[in-house]
């Protein structure tokens, strides 16, 4: 059992390392969104050094007039590269460490979802591998550099699979809650897309739910929990 688990961990790390190979080249590829996201990370680092936390307005942006990018674009996950910058890493190294962790998260997320649904190890490993080398991931990291959108891809499978499992079973939808919490703190548009997909799934199952008060209670509790956890993002945005 332990040997099998060790092999799985080694496999996941090896596949992630293979996908990470383009990052071993010197420099940062300048995709369409690269200037924006690099500026977010660097300005977040500068704001933290000024003692500002949490950072909603990045003071060094917009010719040092400040720009409220953190109000509409969640900064939660780019605190990691920003803190690495504070620790003395270059912007390039900070971004590449973040990207490696992001690739690992993408694999583990899809692996976990498929394993949870099927109970099988090898299909889950295959799904994780295919997901890591899928066009949205490769394009988001190595071409367009849409880091926030790619970060959301970590939580999209959790949200959708969480909804599927919640429809099928009378269990608390913790996967659904984690998925939407991560989506909200990653990318607002991806959250909206996931909401639409989950709503469609809910509508088709509605006739089966009418008399199930426990299921509605679980769903409302999950919605309230996610809303409370993510209020630091959507509260200032709505204001």
How would you name each of these model-derived features?
Residues 1-239:
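Membrane-embedded transmembrane-helix bundle of lipid-linked glycan/lipid transferases
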């Amino acid at each position: 059992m332990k040997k099998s688990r060790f092999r799985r961990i080694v496999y996941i790390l090896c596949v992630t390392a293979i996908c990470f190979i383009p990052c071993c080249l010197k420099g940062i590829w300048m995709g369409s969104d690269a200037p924006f996201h690099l500026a977010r990370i660097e300005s977040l680092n500068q704001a933290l050094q000024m003692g500002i936390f949490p950072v909603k307005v990045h003071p060094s942006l917009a010719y040092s007039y400040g720009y409220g990018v953190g109000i509409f674009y969640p900064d939660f996950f780019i605190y990691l590269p920003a803190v690495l910058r504070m620790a003395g890493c270059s912007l390039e190294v900070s971004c590449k460490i973040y990207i490696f962790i992001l690739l690992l998260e993408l694999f583990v997320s899809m692996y976990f979802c498929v394993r949870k649904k099927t109970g099988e190890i090898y299909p889950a490993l295959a799904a994780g591998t295919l997901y890591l080398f899928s066009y949205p991931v490769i394009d988001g990291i190595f071409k367009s550099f849409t880091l926030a959108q790619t970060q959301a891809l970590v939580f999209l499978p959790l949200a959708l699979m969480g909804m599927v499992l919640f429809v099928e079973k009378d269990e608390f939808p913790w996967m659904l809650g984690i998925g939407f919490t991560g989506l909200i703190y990653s990318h607002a548009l991806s959250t909206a897309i996931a909401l639409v997909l989950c709503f469609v799934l809910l509508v088709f199952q509605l006739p089966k739910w009418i008399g199930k008060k426990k299921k509605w209670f679980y769903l409302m509790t999950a919605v309230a929990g996610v809303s409370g956890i993510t209020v630091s993002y959507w509260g200032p945005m709505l204001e």
